Amino acid sequence: MSFSVDVLANIAIELQRGIGHQDRFQRLITTLRQVLECDASALLRYDSRQFIPLAIDGLAKDVLGRRFALEGHPRLEAIARAGDVVRFPADSELPDPYDGLIPGQESLKVHACVGLPLFAGQNLIGALTLDGMQPDQFDVFSDEELRLIAALAAGALSNALLIEQLESQNMLPGDAAPFEAVKQTQMIGLSPGMTQLKKEIEIVAASDLNVLISGETGTGKELVAKAIHEASPRAVNPLVYLNCAALPESVAESELFGHVKGAFTGAISNRSGKFEMADNGTLFLDEIGELSLALQAKLLRVLQYGDIQRVGDDRSLRVDVRVLAATNRDLREEVLAGRFRADLFHRLSVFPLSVPPLRERGDDVILLAGYFCEQCRLRLGLSRVVLSAGARNLLQHYNFPGNVRELEHAIHRAVVLARATRSGDEVILEAQHFAFPDVTLPPPEAAAVPVVKQNLREATEAFQRETIRQALAQNHHNWAACARMLETDVANLHRLAKRLGLKD
């Protein structure tokens, strides 16, 4: 089978459509699935010896949240090492990273797999993976044809990364190179709230402004602080953490500003405080609302004048510290109640950030669940950890009062429970492995199934045919909307409809 000029032109056109890179990437792999008639495809970005999914088609949504470290995925490592098309035989002993991650076929393993490494010059920047349930699914395509696909995808990804780098340098003063290399924090989520938060982090990171990060307990405020620091010019210097809620009043001033020998009973030597440790770097004050009014006054002086005094010392020390503060309280209300200084609040909240609760982040819960599943898989040495459809449905309908932290603990607990009740190193998380209170799931729609005098295959096809007809009618004959309603891939739906005689 050969690609026509029209097919290649169509792929190139799809890469130019859409507003953002994410939209273009999604269009690319959706088009590839239709052209190559594969069951699943993914575009991955390579960074720090791991592949990060940018867009997927035909795979479970939680794949977007997973991070595929080369050490734990030998097929992806083989793709990263190769300089050309990689075809894995159907009987390959190397586990496929997407086994169990094709919706509706969690118990089946992928049989055909092709990997296309993507390069910018001599540098590996990503990969395209194509998967199928039939062993010979990609035999009709030559390596040369697949190289053309890889070249188009590599060009699109390279341009996107270049634009991202240029935008980052435009926001940052001076040369961005020294601190770009230390970026490690991963903010997982594609919801509007998280997308906006990521943009605001990029903007404020370039400055030296103090930042007040507000959000409920467990939303990831510390992660936001790390992301700000790692994207800032101060990233080559330390990020120092202090939990104000766990700070006894008797030692709080010493922890912040340090002390000299003999300043109080037990002060047997000079000791630097957190501000000194963070000099030329960043100090993250978690739960800032727990500080006493007396300490708030001393903190305000540091923010105003940039000098500190160790406990027991008359001399002042100059420090250059950026302060990031976090709270789960409404500090405006605390100011009105007289429990927080208004002048300190205004000093800290030069650029306020709000971290949305998990219940307002939509499908991000599934992406995060995928990330935690992959973390558990690596930690416990499992070959795969998969979320069943029932588990995904449960996670999407629970409101998570403990936010991301509660989700993380729930996934870890569920993996341990599922592992205990299943032999082998493959774990499928079911709804019963989670212990959420008072979760109300939408009732399944009742459907009258007529008794028919047919064999099993004919009865199954009749049911599929009627189900698709009803879904099309409800969605005004929009095939994409119909596929979403039936929770299947639109390309697979088209093929099934043709086989059932619903399409020419």
From Swiss-Prot:
Molecular functions per Gene Ontology: ATP binding; ATP hydrolysis activity; DNA binding; DNA-binding transcription factor activity
Regions crossing the membrane: none
GO biological process annotation, one example: phosphorelay signal transduction system
Pathway terms, separated by semicolons: Nitrogen metabolism; nitric oxide reduction
4-aspartylphosphate sites (modified residues): D57
Sigma-54 factor interaction domain segment(s): 187-416
Keyword annotations: ATP-binding, DNA-binding, Nucleotide-binding, Phosphoprotein, Transcription, Transcription regulation
Top-level taxon: Bacteria
DNA-binding region in chain numbering: 479-498
InterPro entries: AAA+_ATPase (IPR003593), GAF (IPR003018), GAF-like_dom_sf (IPR029016), Homeodomain-like_sf (IPR009057), NorR (IPR023944), P-loop_NTPase (IPR027417), Sigma_54_int (IPR002078), Sigma_54_int_dom_ATP-bd_1 (IPR025662)
Binding site for ATP: 215-222, 278-287
HAMAP family reported in the protein's UniProt record: NorR
Alphabetical list of NCBIfam families matching this protein: PRK05022.1 (NF003451)
Role played: Required for the expression of anaerobic nitric oxide (NO) reductase, acts as a transcriptional activator for at least the norVW operon. Activation also requires sigma-54.
Protein's recorded name: Anaerobic nitric oxide reductase transcription regulator NorR
Organism of origin: Escherichia coli O17:K52:H18 (strain UMN026 / ExPEC)
Organism phylogeny: Bacteria, Pseudomonadati, Pseudomonadota, Gammaproteobacteria, Enterobacterales
Gene that this polypeptide is encoded by: norR
